[in-house]
Amino acid sequence: MYEVQLDKFQGPLELLYQLVKKNKIEISEISLARITEQYLEYIEHYRDFNLEMASEFMVIASELIELKVKSLLPDSEEDSTEEEKGKTIVQRLKDYHVFKKVTELFREYEKAAGQIYSKPVNLDKYVDNEVNYEIDIDISELVEAFKKAMSSTDGVEVFEGDRNLKKIESEEIKIQDKMDQILELFNQNPDQGLTFSQLVSGNPSKMEIVVTFLSILELTKLRKIEIKQEKLFSDINLRSKAG
């Protein structure tokens, strides 16, 4: 398991997630930007891409992102009942079960093809058909925008016989560079805002979307920008707080 080195914690990423979930460590004290920077440096140094470790990192990082978003946005669940909270917890456990199944699927492809996995993948057989998945309106729509952007990206396609395959490309994108890029866009057009879809347009890689998303959260935490949404499922609007 990949380990992180932070001011408030040193150890496995999964242990950090468990401590945050149990409120042993405040999510506000954790820098997701630094965690991602360390992970990118790690895979750059060791070159040998480990798909199992990468899939585990993405699952846990996604959970930490959701917790971070909830800590930044106003609490909309003040009047929620214990029953509603219980349903939310149960839904989280069901979602985690699906994530684990997907992770097992990636492990199978890692053994069969190293850095190459087949496209498309039918995950229907890994989902319990008796479970009624509903839209959780208590989850930040910012997370939904992130998931939508992640699902719309394509990688570098290669061909092996009649199989259409996708090859995982390693790249290095720094959080600070992306933050500077976003702020520069605001400096060029100080009276205009930006949207999340604009920042991830042009067929970016999944890694770039993750870094962009974390950069937005970090800029929000630093009070450099503010994020708003006009209505449910609409685009995420960003506006500079300079001046």
Curated annotation (Swiss-Prot):
Subcellular location: Cytoplasm
Taxonomic source organism: Halothermothrix orenii (strain H 168 / OCM 544 / DSM 9562)
Example of a GO biological process term: DNA replication
UniProt function note: Participates in chromosomal partition during cell division. May act via the formation of a condensin-like complex containing Smc and ScpB that pull DNA away from mid-cell into both cell halves.
Protein name per its UniProtKB record: Segregation and condensation protein A
Subunit structure, as described in the record: Component of a cohesin-like complex composed of ScpA, ScpB and the Smc homodimer, in which ScpA and ScpB bind to the head domain of Smc. The presence of the three proteins is required for the association of the complex with DNA.
InterPro entries, A to Z: ScpA (IPR003768), ScpA-like_C (IPR023093)
Gene Ontology cellular-component terms listed: cytoplasm
UniProt KW keywords: Cell cycle, Cell division, Chromosome partition, Cytoplasm
Source lineage: Bacteria, Bacillati, Bacillota, Clostridia, Halanaerobiales
